[in-house]
């Protein structure tokens, strides 16, 4: 039932609203924002809620206690302000991108004299070029790494050319940077590289390959075979990337196709990125829907929130037509892009098929999400947790009789690994006899030092049994920190040990909760073992390279970066060694003779 007293009071207030363009906000009895809307005519639009008997209007008026408004100069400004306020207040009656603040982007700092490609989480009108948003920060970091390898764009934080280092960094010596800090490349040459990076991020791989092929031919003509070989490797990398992408259009159009999957008050949106006629990427986003949400609202809200940051293509295809707001959205998109943007529904069979394929992708993704939800719900029920355990950390120790001891931390968010939050710990404590408990305690102490910036997870999982659990609890008691929840998972019988219980918990082998815990435990073990092997390999390599005249710490780093293991270095031919940037012909011969001299 609607409270007629409050409704009449609100209506009287709205009668005095201006007939201007702007944004209106409904508040509930506690002062919390429940809905944000925009209007060409504020007075007319907000009064319509009182004359409308739709479920949405009834729901808003039932909850509302107060209404406020902001006047804007244009409808496009109202659209932008509405988006800003939805992100700020996250009202229950608006469509929202879940965890919107967390979505990372690629940022090409074109305002700098020597631009860099970096990860950003906030769009700013600073002259940079933004790409995204992406759903995984790992994808962003992989792209940055690939750009370094192919284009040798700088990655340092020096404010060039005002401040710069005295000598080039390791990236120069391993061939991942042209060292503009040392003037080894002109500004004009560097900006040619930047243009190549833009083409790469725009998906113009064939154009880049053609240019690189011409360069390779030129080097070969001039008998500069080492340089030609490096260009050849870059071409192969780009060809491999291009081959993985599916050709979906032969007109080389740049467009995004958007599809939705709605279930209860949740939805998923999928964006297919098509560049130069190839499907180069798909991005899936989770949306929170209000209790009552129309198709128009869903499409409009997602398009606005998604394209208020990151890149905008020439064409955006949505699954169905929507309201008169389409005109304002187009104006907003054109203004943000700085050129014409077409916002439309599918026009041909090719686009219809792609939207059908997108719907299948979303259905599969929804089934996966359901399995994760079952696992998290089961964990919450079994361990009597107050909230769904959306964040889980896993810990393990790896060593060989106490030597090269390391610890690992892996992080799972909503049932999936988030590798940017993985951490490796080189154990500082070196007892006479190996002691896994003391090593584990050191790792946990170091993790808890950063608890303000890095809050505790919902579940902390330890690879081990009752002894490991007790060792970890000792550290929490010592530091007077209250854990959310800790458990230890022993490998042999998959026994789960928890605080305050002497007997282990045994889950059935088909339990979704057990499968998730095993995944976290095994990933922590894998990560620890890989780091342990890396340290052992480095120590072994260093012990050999120390004996070779002319190979110091810097060259050791270069060789480790190039060959990873001692075995790979031993197998390397003299030509392979000569190709490594920073390794002269003379040093390459010394290294080769050290490993191959049979005399």
From Swiss-Prot:
Q: Which part of the chain is the GIY-YIG domain?
A: 19-95
Q: Which SMART domains match?
A: GIYc, HhH1
One GO biological process this protein is involved in is: SOS response
Alphabetical keyword list? Cytoplasm, DNA damage, DNA excision, DNA repair, Excision nuclease, SOS response
Which Pfam families does the UniProt record give? GIY-YIG (PF01541), HHH_5 (PF14520), UVR (PF02151), UvrC_RNaseH (PF22920), UvrC_RNaseH_dom (PF08459)
> Cellular component per GO?
cytoplasm; excinuclease repair complex
Concerning InterPro entries, the annotation shows:
GIY-YIG_endonuc, GIY-YIG_endonuc_sf, GIY-YIG_UvrC_Cho, Hlx-hairpin-Hlx_DNA-bd_motif, RuvA_2-like, UVR_dom, UVR_dom_sf, UvrABC_protein_C
As for subcellular location, the record says: Cytoplasm
- Domain UVR, residue spans: 206-241
Family, according to the entry, reads as follows: Belongs to the UvrC family.
Assembly with partners or alone: Interacts with UvrB in an incision complex.
Question: Which HAMAP family has this protein been placed in?
Answer: UvrC (MF_00203)
UniProt function note = The UvrABC repair system catalyzes the recognition and processing of DNA lesions. UvrC both incises the 5' and 3' sides of the lesion. The N-terminal half is responsible for the 3' incision and the C-terminal half is responsible for the 5' incision.
Protein name (record): UvrABC system protein C
The organism encoding this protein is: Dictyoglomus thermophilum (strain ATCC 35947 / DSM 3960 / H-6-12)
The primary gene name is uvrC
């Amino acid at each position: 039932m609607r409270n007629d007293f409050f409704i009449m009071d609100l209506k009287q207030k709205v009668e005095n609203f201006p007939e201007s363009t702007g944004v209106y906000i409904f508040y509930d009895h506690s002062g919390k924002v429940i809905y944000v809307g925009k209007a060409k005519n504020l007075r007319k639009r907000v009064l319509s809620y009182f004359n409308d008997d739709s479920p949405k209007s009834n729901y808003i008026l039932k909850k509302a206690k107060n209404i406020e408004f902001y006047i804007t100069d244009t409808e496009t400004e109202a659209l932008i302000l509405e988006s800003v306020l939805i992100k700020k207040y996250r009202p229950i009656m608006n469509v929202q991108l879940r965890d919107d603040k967390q979505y990372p982007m690629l940022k090409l700092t074109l305002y700098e004299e020597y631009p860099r490609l970096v990860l950003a989480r906030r769009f700013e009108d600073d002259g940079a070029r933004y790409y995204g948003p992406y759903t995984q920060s790992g994808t962003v970091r992989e792209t940055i790494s690939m750009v370094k390898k192919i284009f040798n764009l700088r990655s340092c934080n020096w404010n060039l050319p005002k401040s710069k280092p005295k000598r080039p960094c390791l990236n120069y010596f391993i061939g991942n940077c042209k060292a503009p800090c040392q003037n080894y490349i002109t500004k004009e040459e560097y900006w040619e590289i930047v243009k190549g990076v833009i083409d790469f991020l725009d998906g113009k791989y064939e154009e880049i390959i053609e240019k690189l092929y011409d360069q390779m031919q030129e080097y070969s003509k001039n008998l500069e075979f080492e340089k030609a070989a490096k260009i050849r490797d870059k071409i192969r990398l780009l060809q491999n990337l291009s081959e993985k992408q599916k050709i979906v259009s032969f007109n080389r159009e740049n467009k995004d196709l958007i599809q939705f999957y709605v279930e209860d008050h949740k939805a998923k949106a999928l964006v297919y990125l098509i560049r130069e006629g190839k499907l180069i990427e798909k991005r899936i986003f989770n949306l929170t829907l209000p209790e009552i949400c129309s198709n128009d609202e869903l499409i409009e809200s997602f398009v606005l929130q998604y394209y208020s940051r990151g890149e905008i293509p020439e064409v955006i295809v949505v699954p169905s037509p929507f309201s008169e707001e389409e005109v304002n959205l187009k104006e907003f998109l054109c203004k943000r892009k700085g050129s014409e943007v077409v916002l439309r529904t599918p026009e041909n069979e090719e686009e219809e098929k792609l939207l059908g394929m997108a719907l299948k992708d979303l259905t599969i993704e929804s089934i996966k999400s359901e399995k994760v939800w079952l696992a998290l719900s089961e964990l919450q029920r079994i361990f009597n947790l107050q909230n769904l355990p959306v964040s889980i950390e896993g810990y393990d120790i790896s060593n060989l009789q106490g030597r090269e001891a390391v610890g690992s931390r892996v992080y799972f968010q909503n049932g999936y690994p988030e590798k940017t939050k993985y951490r490796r710990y080189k154990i500082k404590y070196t007892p006479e006899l190996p002691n896994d408990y003391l090593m584990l305690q050191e790792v946990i102490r170091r993790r808890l030092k950063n608890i303000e910036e890095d809050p505790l997870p919902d579940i902390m999982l330890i690879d081990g049994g009752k002894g490991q659990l007790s060792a970890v609890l000792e550290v929490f008691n010592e530091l007077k920190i209250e854990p959310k929840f800790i458990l230890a998972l022993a490998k042999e019988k998959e026994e789960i040990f928890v605080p305050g219980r002497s007997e282990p918990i045994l889950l059935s082998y088909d339990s979704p909760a057990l499968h998730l815990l095993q995944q976290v435990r095994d990933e922590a073990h894998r990560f620890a073992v890989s780091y342990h092997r890396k340290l052992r390999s480095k120590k072994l390599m260093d012990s050999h390279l120390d004996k070779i005249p002319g190979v110091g710490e810097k060259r050791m780093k270069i060789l480790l970066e190039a060959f990873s293991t001692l075995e790979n270095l031993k197998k390397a031919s003299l030509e392979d060694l000569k190709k490594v940037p920073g390794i002269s012909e003379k040093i390459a011969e010394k290294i080769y003779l050290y490993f191959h001299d049979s005399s």
